[in-house]
Each structure stands twice: as C-alpha cells, then as structure tokens.
UniProtKB/Swiss-Prot annotation:
Residues 1-21 are annotated as: Disordered. It comes from the Archaea. GO terms for molecular function: ATP binding; DNA binding; zinc ion binding. This is Transcriptional repressor NrdR. NCBIfam families: transcriptional regulator NrdR (TIGR00244). Belongs to the NrdR family. Coiled coil: none annotated. Residues 49-139 form the ATP-cone domain.
Length: 162
C-alpha cells in the first residue's frame, strides 16, 4: 500500500477492525518513511460486473469512476466522505444483487441521480447536467422546476394535513 502523502510503498498496519457496515475491513496504516497515518478499507472482490456504455462498448465496472462522479457532484457541498462511501457501496451492492453481470451505464446514472436527489439537490443538478449532457440553460431550468416543484408539492401536502 503506497502512502498517499509521500508515495512510499512501505507502510505498516497499526490497527485493524471491521467497518461500521461490516462489509469491509478497516485498517489504520502508518508510512515507514514520513510517519503519515491513513485509513484503508478492504472489501471482498465481487463477481465480475461489466458496464455497457452508450456507444455499445463494454468495460469492467470501476468503483473509483463511480466515486469520482459522485465526489464531483458533491464537491464543496458539505457532504461527508463517509456519506459518499456509503452511497458508492449502496449503488455497487444494488448492481451486484442483480442477476445480470452486464449493466448499462444509464442504469448506474439513474441510481446515482435518485440517491443524489434525496441527499443534496444542488449535487443532483450538477450530476444530471453532466449525465444528461445539458447544452442549453433551459435544460437546467426544466430540471430545477422538477426538483422545486416536487419540494413545493411536499410542502403543500404537509401543511394541508395540519
């Protein structure tokens, strides 16, 4: 395991335990060169999951690619790293639970969209603007209207029942 601070390949494990969700092993490590401490998570390797992209090509599922897309959407939104990790794990688990070993990139995009919409509306708009390849300001307005309209409906429903 390479140190994320200095890149040295010699680290030692100083603490090991189960993660909070029980699906992975949490290891606290220390770099032998610079003494930087960091945490890693080990998880079992899933059955090989393939992603069919829009252009028809098929590639291996890349959890880091999923994480990067979500991190870009939630950047500077105050969303905790543990929340991002849980979201990535939930989406990957949902994909692994499916019978098919090949999933479409659009399915992954929809799962991310659904989760971000409930987590953070701004992150959701950021994500769908890239995922749906918005090219006109009206597309942003249409999506904002849908998000704000749903919030307004929820607000009116909660006030009418009082």
């Amino acid at each position: 395991m390479n140190c994320p601070d200095c890149g040295n390949g010699r680290t030692r494990v100083i603490d090991t335990g189960a993660s909070s969700d029980g699906a992975s092993v949490r290891r606290r490590r220390e770099c032998q060169r610079c003494s930087f401490r960091f945490t890693t998570y080990e998880r079992p390797e899933w059955k090989s999951l393939q992603v069919k992209k829009r252009d028809g090509t098929i590639e291996s599922f890349d959890q880091q690619k999923l994480r990067t897309g979500i991190e870009r959407a939630v950047e500077k939104r105050g969303v905790a790293e543990t929340t991002v990790t849980a979201l990535v794990d939930d989406i990957e688990s949902e994909l692994q639970d499916r019978e098919a070993r090949i999933v479409s990139s659009s399915l992954i995009g929809e799962l991310v969209s659904e989760n971000l919409r409930t987590l953070d509306k701004v992150a959701y708009i950021r994500f769908v603007s890239v995922y749906k390849a918005f090219s006109e300001p009206q597309e942003f307005l249409k999506e904002l209207d849908a998000v704000l309209g749903a919030e307004l409906d929820d607000f009116e429903a909660s006030n009418s029942s009082q």
